[in-house]
Amino acid sequence: MAKNYYDITLALAGICQSARLVQQLAHQGHCDADALHVSLNSVIDLNPGSTLGVFGGSETNLRLGLETLLGVLNASNRQGLNAELTRYTLSLMVLERKLNSAKGAMDTLGDRIAGLQRQLDHFDLQSETLMSAMAAIYVDVISPLGPRIQVTGSPAVLQSSQVQAKVRASLLAGIRAAVLWHQVGGGRLQLMFSRNRLTAQAKQILAHC
């Protein structure tokens, strides 16, 4: 069956968007608020109608992720910030595979996310309460699967409990996107052998944004 590179690229951009948010938070203590909202909301919407629906139904919502994806796919410089983004992206993919193979982990994750939906009746998506709850899910369900993702940035910034919670919530969103990526036919070999196809698709989607 032919692979749907549109959906694969959208999901991959979702992973990259989370990686970029983590990087922004770790270095600056703040991030693109609109992109963060899209990524966090993707965790909570458990019944989207389409791959694009996971990210709010608009390609523009993934602009940051698409731009990051192009940077990761075409990085001639494997050092510094580009290397960080590549490492975060690949680490999220590895953790998703561990989540998929760990007995009961996906069910536990689903139950905990259902709890988030109930909290949304009382709190805003980007409230400290929701951020802390998402961070706790990452710590309790994802982190024990290993290997842990080493987040690098400003030590002073990373000492902030609020930044830590946003970083972990963003990583949880990255796991959500990685699950979606596999569901629509994504695989790590594509990063090596279908790089040109993914690059062309990402550029085509960005042209609409």
From Swiss-Prot:
GO cellular component: cytoplasm; plasma membrane
Keywords: Cell inner membrane, Cell membrane, Coiled coil, Cytoplasm, Membrane
Membrane topology qualifier: Peripheral membrane protein
Name used for this protein in its record: High frequency lysogenization protein HflD homolog
Pfam families reported in the protein's UniProt record: DUF489
NCBIfam families noted in UniProt: PRK00218.1-1 (NF001245), PRK00218.1-2 (NF001246), PRK00218.1-4 (NF001248), PRK00218.1-5 (NF001249)
Protein localization: Cytoplasm; Cell inner membrane
Native source species: Enterobacter sp. (strain 638)
